[in-house]
Amino acid sequence: MNKEIFNSKLFEKLDKDNLIENSREWSNEIDSTWNYNDVVGILKSWESLNTISLEYIDSIVNCLTETGKDILINGSPEAKLYNILTEQGMSPADANKQFGATAFGSAKNKGWIEVKAGKIFKKVESINDIVKSDLSIPDLSKLDSKTLEQYKKSRFIEEKKLSYYRVTKGEQYNKRSKELSDLTIEMLKDDSWEKESFKVNINAMGVVPEQGYRHPLNKVKNEFKQIFLDMGFEEMPTFNFVENGFWNFDALFQPQQHPARELQDTFFIKDPKTSHDFSDEYCERVKQVHSVGGYGSLGWIYDWKLEEAEKNILRTHTTAVSARMLYKLAQNGFKPKKYFSIDRVFRNETLDATHLAEFHQVEGVIADVDISLGHLIGVISEFFKRLGIDNVRFKPAFNPYTEPSMEIFGYHPILKRWVELGNSGIFRPELLLPMGIPENVRVAAWGLSLERPTMIKYGLDNIRAIFGNSINVNFIKNNPICMFESK
């Protein structure tokens, strides 16, 4: 549309009548090809300058349906049936197939057609298509109420909600001037810009700046962290992705010939290949309990090797951090503690819908006098209850460093099966006593996956959709807020 012509017509109308009662009807009268959205855009630009005032009005109007528009062009169904008839006639079946039974009945009732020898023929020389005439009037609401209702039932006419503006003169109407689109150097030099009006709408929304987006896992991680803090836990430092085999395996009473310590399950560091950050006295006690036993245990009965314990690896679990914290706790004089950590761990696993080589582990440790497996089940159940996940199941299991041990499962509504969330249990005396932990102290611990509860909450069936190098960036930008409702 031509903006100059529009503005000319707009101000010509307001100068003459002081108002435009219906912006939609007025613009259609001026030029029916104008897009009404463009019309509204120009009106609002003048409103922003207080040149005009707009009053928004909703109205219910009667409009032609697609069927009604077809009648306006091609005639009513009964008229089309009449016009197609020839001297050879047409069978009622063909008529019904092409135009419907209603057209045949209506044409017959109006006396336009008749049936002879099983065929339809014209009964009159000419017809007056009243339906087409009725639908052609500009204001359909002027039809008598009975006819209007009949056409609505026939779905020729429908009611629509149409909005328009009542336009009147604004405070700055008489001060309007031609808007300039460019600010020139000359205007700045002679201050003439102060007298001009520019095409700038300071109330218009600017472009939303691109910004960083928090990863869904970080959102869930923060919720997990807050739940732990609310339950009285203290966060452990987990900044060491690289551990040696001593803290990751040996201190946890995991034998050196265990399959988890093989190349197919663990990532070994090439350089530096080894490290030694543990005391010789503690190392000797760990070696003793592995090799020949102690503290009421037979041990694993094998030749324990220091060089195996010194090998650097990418930690396979954050329980290595728990081992360091418990050892430190024992050296400084034991006090009951509740620790937690949430960080990355690494496993040389086969990738599938629920397994990654790099993922996050949620670790919890409770150290106190005479606690039991029942305490552990209660704490884990309460933790998941606060996450809003009630469908949790425990299953007896074996772990080298806990006895008794349990696997934790959660039901995945998308996969429609139970998904393993983590492991738990009571730390063995062979792990705790060499550290110097008192004999009457029990330590309950568990390791949970961060990704899998997140998958359940976000309704995902593939772990690679939420973490890893193949994640869709748009998922990070556009994912909805997913809150874990405390219960």
Swiss-Prot record:
| EC top class named in words | ligase
Q: Its gene? A: phesA
Which NCBIfam families does the record associate with it? pheS, PRK04172.1
Subunit and interaction comment = Tetramer of two alpha and two beta subunits.
Tell me, in one coarse class, where this protein mainly resides.
Answer: cytoplasm
Please name the source species.
Dictyostelium discoideum (Social amoeba)
Q: What is its EC number?
A: 6.1.1.20
Q: MF terms per GO, please?
A: ATP binding; magnesium ion binding; phenylalanine-tRNA ligase activity; tRNA binding
* Cited PANTHER family: PHENYLALANINE--TRNA LIGASE ALPHA SUBUNIT, PHENYLALANYL-TRNA SYNTHETASE
| An example Gene Ontology CC term for this record | phenylalanine-tRNA ligase complex
Q: Where are the transmembrane segments?
A: none
Classification lineage:
Eukaryota, Amoebozoa, Evosea, Eumycetozoa, Dictyostelia
GO biological processes: phenylalanyl-tRNA aminoacylation
Catalytic reaction list? tRNA(Phe) + L-phenylalanine + ATP = L-phenylalanyl-tRNA(Phe) + AMP + diphosphate + H(+)
Q: In which residues is L-phenylalanine bound?
A: 319, 361-363, 401, 427
* Compartments, record wording: Cytoplasm
Identify which cofactors the protein needs according to its UniProt entry: Mg(2+)
**InterPro entries in the record, alphabetically?**
aa-tRNA-synth_II (IPR006195), aa-tRNA-synth_II/BPL/LPL (IPR045864), Phe-tRNA-synth_IIc_asu (IPR004529), Phenylalanyl-tRNA_Synthase (IPR002319), PheRS_DBD3 (IPR040725)
Instruction: Quote the protein name from its UniProt record.
Output: Phenylalanine--tRNA ligase alpha subunit
Query: What's in the keyword line of the UniProt record?
Result: Aminoacyl-tRNA synthetase, ATP-binding, Cytoplasm, Ligase, Magnesium, Metal-binding, Nucleotide-binding, Protein biosynthesis
* Pfam families in the record: PheRS_DBD3, tRNA-synt_2d
Query: Where, by residue number, does Mg(2+) bind?
Result: 403
Q: Which family does it belong to?
A: Belongs to the class-II aminoacyl-tRNA synthetase family. Phe-tRNA synthetase alpha subunit type 2 subfamily.
Q: Which Gene3D superfamilies match?
A: 1.10.10.2320, 1.10.10.2330, 3.30.1370.240, Bira Bifunctional Protein, Domain 2
Lineage, top-rank taxon, reads Eukaryota
